[in-house]
Amino acid sequence: MSEGSINLNNSNNSSDSAANCGSFKDCSLFKLHNTVYRDVKNADDSNNSSVTPIVLIHGFPVDHRMWDACADSLNSQIDAALSEGALKHDVPIFAPDMVGAGLSEAPKAEREFSEADYAHALDALSASYIKLIKDLGYERAVWVGLSMGGYVALDVQRLLPQAVAGIALCDTRACVDAPQARAKRLEIAEVCERDRTVEPVMHFAHATEKDSTVKQSPEFIQTFENWINDQKPEGLAWRQRMAACRPDMEDQLPLITAPAAVISGTLDPSSAPEIMRPMADAMTSSKHVDFTVVEDCGHFSATEHPYEVANALVTLLQNVQHN
């Protein structure tokens, strides 16, 4: 499903579909369901010029609900920061579902998979996030991406850097997948779509003895199983193909001028601190880059340790408002 259009002048390619649109000039984009964790109504500022929202972008293979506990903690910590004067302005908290995740509809597959169809899929998704924020009356946001959500946050920076008031990268990477990992994504997408099943991604809910204390808990396992069972197989397939065909964005790190946060769990099997610290070090154009290591934490830091992640995000918001 697609709706609306947006003109992003940073891109030079062209195409004719939402999932294969490079220029985004008069391009139909995806309609994303947006969860509002915190709203701000400022009667004295109808144009929202002094208010900058924070946008929480979820990881794969779940939806915005992975942010529930973190958003609750973020709400409380924003209240405290406002009362103490550490924040000058209130902060709306939004968490849109990606294409085919949660309450956002998945595009209909009209033909067999072709890599060309997904060459600009990430751009279309990222532009849809930007359009959602602009439709709400905001020119900029603090973009927070976890895992696959980090690809979107970095792509927003690539497409429209002036829309980035701040950026947080959690449990993610800027580089493309290694060939074997890329092939695995495409294989999972094929099985999910062909067999109408979520089973190929259910391993995200299951723990090993190397995982964090939280991830090994029955509550975490059951919650993640429920979230995954709620997903649309065609949505999982689309997002896996989008990620498999995404561009390398390591070149974006030194171009980030806004305040930034990089968050990594010590037990993350794919984006541990030794992988993410160089990403923070590469952000040489930003005056504020905070690197947070979360102990006993795996790949879903915001779900496993919501308070610690929310605390890092409040620090980022303070840096944004005082930048």
Language-model regions, residue ranges each:
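Active-site loop/oxyanion-hole signature of alpha/beta-hydrolase fold enzymes
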Residues: 16, 20-45, 65-144, 159-160, ...
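Acidic beta-to-alpha connecting loop that harbors the catalytic carboxylate
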Residues: 266-269, 296-298
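Flexible "cap/lid" loop of the alpha/beta hydrolase fold
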Residues: 151-199
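Conserved alpha/beta-hydrolase catalytic His-Asp/Glu region
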Residues: 177-183, 195-255
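Short beta-strand/loop motif that positions the catalytic acidic residue
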Residues: 256, 262-264, 268
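Catalytic histidine-centered segment of alpha/beta-hydrolase-like enzymes
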Residues: 291-311
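Short alpha-helix in the alpha/beta-hydrolase fold that links the catalytic acid
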Residues: 258, 272-281
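Active-site glycine-rich loops that stabilize anionic/oxyanionic intermediates
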Residues: 51, 59-62, 147
